[in-house]
């Protein structure tokens, strides 16, 4: 009887595995596609642009610094696979004025055609204890990390729905899946992208438009190096419990997931665990994905409790260390 039950379970899983591709989105063909990348002058954004260009896409790079844009353009063009490919550069702050963002998207579409894939990669990170952060820091991060993704997405979505095809990618962070010491401003702005993505996916899925939320870990980028200069000790020690990823590795995974129409894009085993653990009511791209989340949830929650205990221990040790230093200073 037990053997029969096991055989039935295996047969059921195999059936799901075979049926799953039939209900998954049709992959987006990148050769000849128009890909817009905000925050594309450096870091993950630039690497995403390179990865798409390698596969034959036409690229529109959007960022604030014109000099960095032109430098990135030269680097990306080295990876062309045919002489028809184009890299268009547009200098604009995507978080300030929606009408300006809408206009530059129209310009890009007039030159390179309708946008097939938008990658919202513009963002920044600032860390610090809640009471030490200025209120303006919360406003700034919400503007750049959240509205800086809302505006470009709003500018392309109508055309995608009309064409009944497209991809919209939101680059969040693992700090957009769990809140950590020092990230009260950053995490909240990245968590907001998850809610936006889930609601938007439900709206546009009937039009064959698919949304991807990427949750990269700490990545070796200029932004990460700058963030480390002011990162609280507790935040730095927690971050050091995992390794730093290369932006090329992160970009390759994001592009792969976006092309496939996957809602979640995670990097590495920790990323996979976090995405499964925090899936909530998020959409799934395949039956197998949903089944994996159901099966692994209990195990991953158990592992997560050990992680949380470790992080809390780091915070307590730092607190005790500071208290000792204060005592020494008072007695000196």
From Swiss-Prot:
Pfam families: adh_short. Changing residue 175 to T: Found in cattle affected by a bovine form of spinal muscular dystrophy; impairs activity; partially complements a yeast knockout mutant. One of its GO terms (biological process) is sphingolipid biosynthetic process. GO terms for cellular component: endoplasmic reticulum membrane. Its EC number is 1.1.1.102. NADPH binds at residues 39, 41-43, 64, 68, 93. SUPFAM superfamilies: NAD(P)-binding Rossmann-fold domains (SSF51735). Residues 1-25 form the signal peptide. PROSITE patterns: ADH_SHORT. It is linked to Defects in KDSR may be the cause of a bovine form of spinal muscular dystrophy. This is 3-ketodihydrosphingosine reductase. The gene is KDSR.
